[in-house]
Amino acid sequence: TDAERWKSIDQRKAEDYVRKLQARIVKAQREGRHGKVKSLQWLLTHSFYGRYLAVVRVTTNKGKNTAGVDRVRWSTDAAKVKAIDTLKRRGYQPMPLRRVEIPKKNGKKRPLGIPTMKDRAMQALYLMALDPIAETTGDQHSYGFRKYRSCQDAIAQCHNVLSRDVAPKWVLEGDIKGCFDHISHKWLLNNIPMDKEVLRKWLKSGYVFNGELFPTDEGTPQGLSLIHISEPTRPY
């Protein structure tokens, strides 16, 4: 049965397979072999184990019970194993995000876009192929939304810099107003080293709020797994 097929998949073997591919992506990126990087990314995003781990990720995280506009949840093993076969680039068309508003401490509300389970899994899949590049080329002193990094690491770096005998006298705090709301789609497509057609579809998928469909001509949805990669990286 489908449920038995799901239970029979060796997750450790899947993780080893993906980890080795990611290590090869890092090696190719460091050697400047961008064609090789692309082919390895393609291999990862089309692999059974990569697609399996993407389904595992979205069905075990905190949002596993939160559905998108289609109200579909992958709550059974049978649904999960069937989902693996749906994660294909050919013919893929993401659905609009379901927008909800989250109350903030200051009384205002923060919009959050909730993708469907399938779109979340596709994002998780492509993120596996993108993360090795982001971690290789990203700023070593960037800590926000980075793997294995936290605000404690940022604090430690500030302490290291500011405790020196010859230390900076000023600390500049800056904030880009409405950064994710207005970031250029053209810039993202030119600078994010991933499948451009898939990225374009995510950026242009729109969102549904109060039963009405809205287009997305600029900015990235707060809820899109790849937004943390939006810091400058080296394009192909």
Positions of predicted regions on the chain:
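Single conserved hydrophobic/aromatic residue that forms the stacking wall/gate
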Residues: I227-Y236
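Charged boundary/loop elements
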Residues: A3-G63, M128-G144
